[in-house]
């Protein structure tokens, strides 16, 4: 089971400002992620640049429109993520409880969402051909 731990953005992260206690935060994150590695559950982790360095693609009918950042509502955006793979939801929840507070000096939150696995789509008739092709891609990526 794969889970994404998402660190919610703040006005500071959206401004590209590192907190005054950034050294303490980086140290706590390094220790936590090292524990994930030792447990064999870490798949990936990274911080995201502010939305001003990104863009969105808006779909209207068959038309695609690129909209450059920055975007409003920082609290709805993600400032970073950690992707883990665990045997159970409970194990993922335990790792989440140990996640360092992303912003020591003010209120913040993380959100955790489980990723779909290909087997989750096995009963969807329209997905059956695509599932086989996605499995081939997974095999190629692992080589």
Predicted features along the sequence, with ranges:
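Conserved, structured core segments of small domains
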Residues: 1-143
């Amino acid at each position: 089971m794969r889970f994404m731990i998402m660190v919610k953005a703040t006005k500071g992260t959206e401004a590209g400002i590192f907190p005054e206690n950034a050294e303490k935060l980086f140290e706590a994150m390094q220790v936590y992620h090292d524990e994930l590695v030792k447990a064999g559950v870490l798949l990936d982790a990274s911080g995201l640049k502010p939305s001003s360095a990104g863009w969105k693609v808006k779909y209207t009918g068959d038309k695609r429109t690129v909209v450059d950042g920055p975007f409003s509502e920082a609290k709805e955006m993600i400032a970073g993520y950690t992707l883990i793979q665990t045997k159970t939801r409970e194990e993922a929840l335990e790792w989440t409880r140990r996640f360092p507070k992303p912003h020591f000096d003010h209120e913040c939150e993380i959100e955790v969402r489980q990723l779909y696995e290909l087997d989750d789509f096995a009963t969807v008739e329209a997905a059956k051909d695509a599932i086989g092709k996605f499995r081939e891609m997974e095999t190629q990526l692992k080589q």
